Amino acid sequence: MELSEPIVENGETEMSPEESWEHKEEISEAEPGGGSLGDGRPPEESAHEMMEEEEEIPKPKSVVAPPGAPKKEHVNVVFIGHVDAGKSTIGGQIMYLTGMVDKRTLEKYEREAKEKNRETWYLSWALDTNQEERDKGKTVEVGRAYFETEKKHFTILDAPGHKSFVPNMIGGASQADLAVLVISARKGEFETGFEKGGQTREHAMLAKTAGVKHLIVLINKMDDPTVNWSNERYEECKEKLVPFLKKVGFNPKKDIHFMPCSGLTGANLKEQSDFCPWYIGLPFIPYLDNLPNFNRSVDGPIRLPIVDKYKDMGTVVLGKLESGSICKGQQLVMMPNKHNVEVLGILSDDVETDTVAPGENLKIRLKGIEEEEILPGFILCDPNNLCHSGRTFDAQIVIIEHKSIICPGYNAVLHIHTCIEEVEITALICLVDKKSGEKSKTRPRFVKQDQVCIARLRTAGTICLETFKDFPQMGRFTLRDEGKTIAIGKVLKLVPEKD
């Protein structure tokens, strides 16, 4: 069976994604090769390894399909990379190849793109929804689209690649299970994306910080005249990327998979391409379908970090369920404001459903709270198991990039799960030796680039957070300043407020 054609029964042909819910084949839950991606890797000596200690929390992904439909595993894929690497184009092409966007719609986009002299961008219009993005050809919000393979249901998070949009990218990465780093093989473009100031480095680092375990590197634009499906150019790009990705904390043998492709022609995305006989391995979509299952558990406490909210016959919140399961009619609490709410309705990837499990992207209609009383970064919890909230915490941080020294009193912007808040480093507690993990006996007066320290941080307002040990997804963070990611960190302990 072709991998991603809609399954047809009883002689029916055209089906919308909604109808096809009723028509899917039974898929065995216990897939061979299950288990978390990228476990048991050798300790690499890099700052990021220190971030990735025991993650025993159930992995935040699972799926409950609407009644009567078989279950497919939900996986969030974030496309990352430099601004013109071709992320949206690949996203659009995948939507087309898996039958989520039909030829007519694609041709309409192609015509509109031509009229605006944006010819090669037509595929990305399937993802870029608003006019401003289409005019600029840049993806600003995190675009959302989904496609299905035989065994899995994928949501594409198309994260922007422009420098000023990195905070949006962080939101995308914090919801992703899997990252696809799109690299342009075109002469000059690869170099721009990768050199200082290019987005490639920062995006890969953010994905790792956000807890993305598995990275697929698509070397795109292989059809470009400057590349012409050259194996040498492909290997050259690979060689330059591996040391960097290793430094960020990805294990090249277990966590990274490279493949060549062309987003514009669709070569090597769904079917093996004749252009690169030198590439042995599955094309992109079959490779995704055959990934081992993510370890998942529905028994954890309910945690749903809010990404966005709007008014529509009540208050609707958007987010990815990180842990636990939610059902219609359930009483929940919105933290940190301890607002009691009731679940009136649930949409999982725009399909109405009564119960959902971790990993699903949800729109939840709530009763008992106004839209203006909610901010991104708030968290929906079980009344009997609230998340922690506060302003002061101790954390281990790694200074990634900062020209000058950092002293107590330093201010930055904290990005933790879906929350963005101003933060001050109020005290430096000790330095941590990168290799041995030993802590210094004396308090440092300052820290500088590439050092690891334990520090006390205090946010401007109350935020929801957990220790990294208890809940990795809500205990890892980045610090940004002047448009750059300057540090990554993990929460070690919450410090109670003094009255």
UniProtKB/Swiss-Prot annotation:
What cystine linkages occur within this chain? none
Instruction: Show the segment(s) annotated as G5.
Output: 262-264
Please give a single GO biological process term from the UniProt record. Answer: nuclear-transcribed mRNA catabolic process, nonsense-mediated decay
Q: Where is the composition biased (Basic and acidic residues)?
A: 41-50
Residues where GTP binds: 84-89, 220-223, 262-264
Task: Give one GO molecular function term.
Answer: translation release factor activity
According to the UniProt entry, the coiled-coil residues are none
Gene3D superfamilies, per database record: P-loop containing nucleotide triphosphate hydrolases, Translation factors
Region Disordered, as annotated, extends over 1-69
Locate the region G3. Answer: 158-161
**Per its UniProt record, what Pfam families does this chain match?**
GTP-eEF1A_C, GTP_EFTU, GTP_EFTU_D2
Record keyword S-adenosyl-L-methionine present? no
Region G1, as annotated, extends over 81-88
Q: What is its EC number?
A: 3.6.5.-
The annotated region (G4) lies at 220-223
Q: Where is the tr-type G domain?
A: 72-298
Q: Which domain of life is it from?
A: Eukaryota
**What reactions does this protein catalyze?**
GTP + H2O = GDP + phosphate + H(+)
Q: Does the keyword Phosphoprotein apply?
A: no
Question: Any one cellular component term from GO for this entry?
Answer: cytosolic ribosome
On assembly, the entry states:
Component of the eRF1-eRF3-GTP ternary complex, composed of ETF1/ERF1 and ERF3 (GSPT1/ERF3A or GSPT2/ERF3B) and GTP. Component of the transient SURF (SMG1-UPF1-eRF1-eRF3) complex. The ETF1-GSPT1 complex interacts with JMJD4. Interacts with PABPC1. Interacts with SHFL.
Say which family it is in: Belongs to the TRAFAC class translation factor GTPase superfamily. Classic translation factor GTPase family. ERF3 subfamily.
Q: What does this protein do?
A: GTPase component of the eRF1-eRF3-GTP ternary complex, a ternary complex that mediates translation termination in response to the termination codons UAA, UAG and UGA. GSPT1/ERF3A mediates ETF1/ERF1 delivery to stop codons: The eRF1-eRF3-GTP complex binds to a stop codon in the ribosomal A-site. GTP hydrolysis by GSPT1/ERF3A induces a conformational change that leads to its dissociation, permitting ETF1/ERF1 to accommodate fully in the A-site.
Q: What is this protein called?
A: Eukaryotic peptide chain release factor GTP-binding subunit ERF3A
**Organism name:** Homo sapiens (Human)
